Every structure is written in C-alpha cells, then in structure tokens.
C-alpha cells in the first residue's frame, strides 16, 4: 500500500468547507462546529493535517493554545508540555486505508521535532467508541484518567502516548 501524502491546513485553505462538512458528519464522536469556529481552531492549531482534499483530518494543539475545551484543560492542569489531539476523522469512503494512522505518524514526527515528549487525547467511554479505543491502543496510547463532559452526558477516557 502506498503511504498517502499529508499536508498542513491553514485558515486560507479552499477545502475548509469540505473539512468542516467531514467534521460535522461525524459530530456524534467529535463536536459540531460553525465555519468560524472551525477556522479559529485551524488557526490556533499546533498541527492540522489533511489527506487529499477531505479524506482525513487530524487537528491538534500544544499546551499554550488558547482553547477552552474541558478535555484540553484537563491535560493542561496535569502536564506542563504536550500535544493534544482534538479530533481525528476519516471520511466514510476513505476508511480502512491507513489515513488516520498516517496523520498520527506525521504528528508524532512533528511533535518530537518541536521538543514534545507526549501526545494526548480523549476517547468517548460512554457512549462507547470501540473503534477509536482499539485504534488508539494499537498506536500505544494508555489511559491516564476519566472525566464527564457535556453536563455528564458523556464520559471520556483520557489517553497518553509517550514519544
């Protein structure tokens, strides 16, 4: 299998609308965003990688980001330095091609190059997301905590991978 090329996304990207649509199609596991919110997240990101125009997206922040997500803040309270994966999503038609794994591999290289020693994220525990659980476990992530979000309507597992 050929490894797909990744590229970085910035706010001026013409495909932002396609990426936003990809995000919002998967809002049950991510969160629904407006165009303005999505553009702000991309602009604030440590790494915003995409494969093709909108086959896969990984959006992450480092510890200094101006971001008020309760999950991001959970990590900020516990670690001085980290890269937080806010969302990773693959289009339904592109699943099974290794795109998310490729984006994570690119993120790990860039995070190490920037002097980071850990990448963190959260995965839904309730409602469960077994595909994401298995994927992150295969990448070497381990659970470091749990928390309730959205007025206790969701429970998440906080995960960490040392680089």
Describe each PLM feature range:
Residues 59-87, 151:
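Conserved acyl-donor/pantetheine-binding loop and adjacent beta-alpha core of acyl/acetyltransferases
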Residues 146-163:
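C-terminal "cap" of GNAT-fold acetyltransferases
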Residues 125-145:
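Conserved active-site alpha-helix within GNAT-family acetyltransferase domains
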């Amino acid at each position: 299998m050929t490894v797909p090329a990744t590229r970085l996304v910035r706010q001026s990207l013409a495909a932002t609308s396609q990426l936003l649509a990809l995000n919002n199609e998967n809002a049950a596991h991510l969160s629904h965003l407006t165009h303005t919110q999505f553009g702000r997240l991309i602009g604030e990101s440590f790494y915003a990688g995409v494969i093709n125009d909108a086959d896969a997206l990984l959006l992450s922040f480092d510890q200094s980001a101006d971001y008020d997500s309760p999950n991001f803040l959970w990590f900020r309270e516990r670690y001085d330095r980290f890269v937080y994966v806010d969302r990773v999503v693959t289009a339904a038609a592109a699943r099974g091609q290794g795109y998310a794994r490729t984006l994570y591999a690119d993120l790990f290289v860039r995070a190490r190059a920037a002097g980071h020693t850990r990448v963190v994220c959260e995965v839904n525990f309730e409602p469960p997301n077994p595909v994401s659980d298995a994927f992150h476990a295969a990448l070497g992530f381990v659970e470091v905590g749990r928390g309730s979000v959205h007025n206790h309507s969701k429970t998440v597992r906080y995960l960490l991978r040392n680089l």
